[in-house]
């Protein structure tokens, strides 16, 4: 049954995916007008002069900042958020969870170690990016390094943005921007190319919270990632999955079949040893199909389940809990989360603007982790069944690996459940599935968010 469902789904998606292959200019980057570094040691450095196109960064009902664009030139709009991460800008910019957001870096210098290649590993996963394309609607930085140095780098940040048809610019006092966002909360904003800000454009602000962003970043048809010699087969619901989540699972001995976010997973769960729900962008309220499918799954199956980030929120909603929008979210690589079962504190990587309201969890679930900075919920677990989820990212990339053991815990749950079966079931992907399904995401391309106002 699963093989036929997956093959039919893949065939239906092929036609619509064919029309989404074009790349579009949809992002803008800001750089500071401060003096740029003159050079670096260790290798020949490509040099590119900064762009001279003026641009403005406008926060709705807030201040206007002026700067210079670098990369492609295009007007964009989205939700302005900030990250305090010191490194990992290639991973952050390609993280599907940032879809629809203008990302402000508090680190004053961005681009000093360049941008790596799109090389893939032994599992056909991207080594250095979290998805094949830039995902955020735009970035704002204080200063951009036109000279870079790193052994993995193949191009500069500005070259990468231009190649991805992404417009960028200095400018701005990012301290003032972050202060505003911290006090007022995440806000709608836009980046406009041109000399002057036009107040008449205020109506064109796009609120990504009103858009089903998961639909845009999720694979349009199932695909498979084989772990050679693996005895486990996990169904992963793709709400905008990061490459390193896939890598953490397949490298630990689990082959994966990755499904679109709205796939009726409860209908094929018997053909898998576990179910995993990935991270993703936007408001979880738009994923009602996923919530319904997960609720049906837990009603009809005892299969082990794990969720991360948006996957955590959707799993919580499926059991009746509620989510809330945070004032400015948690986006950093150094956020402490307390394990309430052991009393241990883990330094975690986080990227989310919504959180689960722990007071609404049903009695058969309990809090697993709590944020030591703001007290928000960071995880939950079932009291008797092998179901748990985390708001933070145990796969990091970038960030600390303190909590990567959670992938091992999940796969231990999967193996234990498989061993407890009265009749052994070989759920490994068949040769038919390996031959028919794609080996990477299907039909996911950059889309200009401004076009969906």
Curated annotation (Swiss-Prot):
Residues 233-420 form the Glutamine amidotransferase type-1 domain. Pathway: Amino-acid biosynthesis; L-arginine biosynthesis; carbamoyl phosphate from bicarbonate: step 1/1. Its EC number is 6.3.5.5. It is found in: Mitochondrion matrix. It is an enzyme of class 6 (ligase). GO terms for cellular component: mitochondrial matrix. Its main location: mitochondrion. One of its GO terms (molecular function) is glutaminase activity. Signal peptide: none annotated. Pfam families: CPSase_sm_chain, GATase. The keyword Nucleotide-binding applies. GO terms for biological process: 'de novo' pyrimidine nucleobase biosynthetic process; glutamine metabolic process; L-arginine biosynthetic process. The active site is at residues 309, 393, 395. In eukaryotes this enzyme is synthesized by two pathway-specific (arginine and pyrimidine) under separate control. Heterodimer composed of 2 chains; the small (or glutamine) chain promotes the hydrolysis of glutamine to ammonia, which is used by the large (or ammonia) chain to synthesize carbamoyl phosphate. This is Carbamoyl phosphate synthase arginine-specific small chain. The gene is cpa1.
């Amino acid at each position: 049954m699963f093989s036929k469902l997956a093959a039919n789904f893949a065939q239906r998606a092929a036609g619509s995916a064919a029309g989404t292959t074009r790349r579009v200019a949809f992002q803008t980057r800001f750089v500071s007008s401060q003096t740029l570094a003159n050079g670096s040691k260790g290798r020949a450095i490509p040099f590119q002069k900064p762009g001279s196109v003026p641009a403005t960064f406008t926060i709705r009902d807030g201040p206007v900042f002026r700067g210079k664009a670098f990369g492609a030139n295009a007007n964009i709009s989205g939700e302005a958020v900030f990250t305090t991460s010191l490194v990992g800008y290639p991973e952050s910019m390609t993280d599907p969870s940032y879809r629809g957001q203008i990302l402000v870096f508090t680190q004053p210098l961005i681009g000093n170690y360049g941008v790596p290649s799109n090389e893939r590993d032994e599992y056909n996963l991207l080594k250095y990016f979290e998805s094949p394309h830039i995902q955020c609607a735009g970035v704002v930085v204080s200063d951009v390094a036109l000279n870079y140095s790193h052994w993995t780098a193949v191009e500069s940040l500005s070259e990468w943005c231009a190649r991805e048809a992404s417009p960028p610019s200095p400018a701005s006092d990012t301290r003032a921007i972050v202060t505003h966002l911290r006090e007022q909360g995440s806000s709608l904003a836009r980046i406009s190319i041109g000399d002057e800000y036009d107040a008449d454009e205020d109506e064109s602000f796009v609120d990504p919270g009103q858009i089903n962003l998961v639909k845009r970043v999720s694979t349009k048809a199932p695909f498979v990632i084989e772990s050679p010699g693996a005895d486990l087969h996990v169904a992963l619901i793709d709400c905008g999955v990061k490459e390193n989540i896939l890598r953490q699972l397949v490298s630990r001995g689990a082959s994966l079949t990755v499904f679109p976010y709205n796939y009726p997973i409860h209908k094929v769960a018997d053909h898998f040893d576990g179910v995993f729900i990935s991270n993703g962008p936007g408001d979880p309220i738009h994923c009602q199909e996923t919530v319904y499918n997960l609720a049906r799954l837990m009603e009809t199956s005892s299969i082990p389940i794990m969720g991360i980030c948006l996957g955590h929120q959707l799993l919580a909603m499926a059991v009746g809990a509620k989510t809330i929008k945070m004032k400015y979210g948690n986006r950093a690589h150094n956020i402490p989360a307390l394990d309430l079962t052991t009393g241990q504190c883990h330094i975690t990587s986080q990227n989310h603007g919504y959180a689960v309201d722990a007071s609404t969890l049903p009695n058969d679930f309990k809090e697993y982790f709590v944020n030591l900075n703001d007290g928000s919920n960071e995880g939950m677990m079932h009291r008797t069944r092998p179901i748990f989820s985390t708001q933070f990212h145990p796969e990091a990339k970038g960030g600390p690996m303190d909590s990567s053991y959670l992938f091992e815990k999940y796969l231990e749950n999967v193996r234990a459940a498989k061993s407890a079966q009265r009749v052994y079931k070989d759920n490994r992907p068949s040769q038919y599935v390996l031959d028919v399904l794609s080996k990477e995401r299907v039909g996911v391309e950059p889309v200009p968010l401004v076009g969906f106002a």
